[in-house]
Amino acid sequence: MDTSENAASAAEQQPTQQIDQLTVPNAPDGGSSAPAPSTSPNSISPSNPTGTPAPGASAQTPNPNAAGASASGSANYKLMCTLEGHTKSISSAKFSPCGKYLGTSSADKTVKIWNMDHMICERTLTGHKLGVNDIAWSSDSRCVVSASDDKTLKIFEIVTSRMTKTLKGHNNYVFCCNFNPQSSLVVSGSFDESVRIWDVKTGMCIKTLPAHSDPVSAVSFNRDGSLIASGSYDGLVRIWDTANGQCIKTLVDDENPPVAFVKFSPNGKYILASNLDSTLKLWDFSKGKTLKQYTGHENSKYCIFANFSVTGGKWIISGSEDCKIYIWNLQTREIVQCLEGHTQPVLASDCHPVQNIIASGALEPDNKIHIWRSDV
């Protein structure tokens, strides 16, 4: 079985509504999309990860010309530095809410915590027996939860590197995870087709949702933790009531391609969903309508993360199987920049909560994390 990679990919105009700092349209949008693959894609990274310990992490000063801006748009991200240390594919990269740290997970079975001030690896968290597919931060930036092919999740305390809980219950690869905003619950999705909700204090599963008919690729809480979005290879995005575990909405488009990633917008009114037909869609989930679709990248095999950037320009950001990171104008759907520098598909990406910084991570044999900065 493969191990660690996750995702995203992306309709039209008339901006009117404010989403926190994001303005999005309320008119549905059309757009053609490539046919969905005939079979469910493979999990996500190299199989049978070895236990080879990662070498000491380093920060390297890269060629500033590695990032290329498009002729249109105003994004001007440039490669700031490269972080090395993981020995296998990078599956996810997440900035801490405080912005001081970057957490990365890998098929090498480890989670690394990088200090963003000094661009060094401060801690390597170990304990999983197989590759790690995803991580998430608690709201106070004190803990991370990790999801692994070993069918478990683990909660680590960052200051001490201590593993405080192991969450057991899934009977197949655990592919995705997230804390609720209160950091009292963890939600997880698995290849066993279920979504589970866990009590952080006790480490016990308090709800098991028979969520989908294929592997669950992504889970996301909304801004107050009252709702959970889940995406699956069955082509559905489902919205769940956290308190009672009931499905309150199912989003599906006409062609029903596998869903590789889902994420609530900052104000919780919209959902960004990536499909394995090389599209990213922005949904008004209350109306069950697609508002915008973003295309131009390649995404037919892996689960690739996608992001809202709100610190400078209002962008949608995603990795791609052509080894690049794509940046779209949220409103116009135009590709405003394409970042080049990785040598393998880019599954992991995240946007810094305060600064105009993007982190990206690639599959092996690249295994590198690039840090990009913009002054716009």
From Swiss-Prot:
Alphabetical list of PROSITE patterns matching this protein: WD_REPEATS_1, WD_REPEATS_2, WD_REPEATS_REGION
Keywords of the record: Chromatin regulator, Developmental protein, Nucleus, Repeat, RNA-mediated gene silencing, Transcription, Transcription regulation, WD repeat
Main location: nucleus
Site-annotated residues for Important for interaction with histone H3: 149, 175, 305, 364
WD repeats: 85-115, 127-157, 169-199, 211-241, 254-284, 296-329, 341-373
Summary of subunit composition and partner proteins: Component of the SET2 complex (also known as the SET1/COMPASS complex), which contains at least set-2, swd-2.1, cfp-1, rbbp-5, wdr-5.1, dpy-30 and ash-2. Within the complex, interacts with cfp-1, ash-2, dpy-30 and hda-1. Interacts with histone H3 both unmethylated and methylated at 'Lys-4'. Interacts with jmjd-3.1, ceh-6, sox-2, sem-4 and egl-27. Interacts with set-2.
Designated name of the protein: WD repeat-containing protein wdr-5.1
Natural source organism: Caenorhabditis elegans
Gene: wdr-5.1
